[in-house]
Amino acid sequence: MKCFAQRGFSGATTRAIAAEAGVTLPAIAYHFGNKEGLHHACARVILGRYQDRMSPVVTAARAAVRSGALTAAGARDILLEIMQGLIEAFMQEAGETHQSRFVSRELSDRGPAYEYLMKELWRPGVLLVADLLAIASGRNATTDRDKTAALMFLSSLTALSNQSAISLSILDRSRFTDSDRVIAGQLAGGMIDGLLGHG
């Protein structure tokens, strides 16, 4: 993942990847088929880590949205729970720059795993948040405004993920603290209320 994160798919060679991992070129071919297979395996690892952390709350949220019985207050609570889960995950992984850089590269370069991550992670996540924002606003139908709000809301988390080095430098520390997590959670609640017009 490190080579892809640093050089992108086109810039990373299987020779460099093998040297970095301390394996032979045939080992990559045996386990992954080729460079693209290895690249997709990295994307699956990222998706798996996200699912391990977020699957319970996301699964419950999707079921609540589908039920049609979710109240505005309930939708707001779920939004906050999702944001707090993401804040916790990103702050814990702030030092793992290869994962966030890999994702950033996929977004900017549209590498081979872009469509996979879009289909399995980004699109469903943004649309779920948009649906919850609509319900929390008292609407049954999700609008383009809800989708745009979800995009802007979730993109604010880049300060904790692929931009964490900048954030930590500004905060004058080497890692996020428990106090940072509390403050970020409180701010997330304020952002939700602002998007819902409750601020």
PLM regions: where:
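Short, basic, alpha-helical segments at the C-terminal edge of helix-turn-helix-like DNA-binding modules
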Residues: V45-R49, V58
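All-alpha amphipathic helical-bundle segments outside canonical DNA-binding/catalytic cores
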Residues: L117-E120, S137-L154
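Amphipathic alpha-helical segments used for helix-helix packing
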Residues: E93-Y116, S164-S169
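Hydrophobic alpha-helical connector segments
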Residues: S55-G95, D146-F153
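Short alpha-helical scaffolding segments that buttress acidic/His motifs in well-ordered protein cores
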Residues: L86, S100-L107, F153-L157
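Helix-turn-helix
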Residues: C3-V45
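Amphipathic alpha-helical packing segments from all-alpha helical-bundle domains
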Residues: D77, G111-S137, Q186-G190
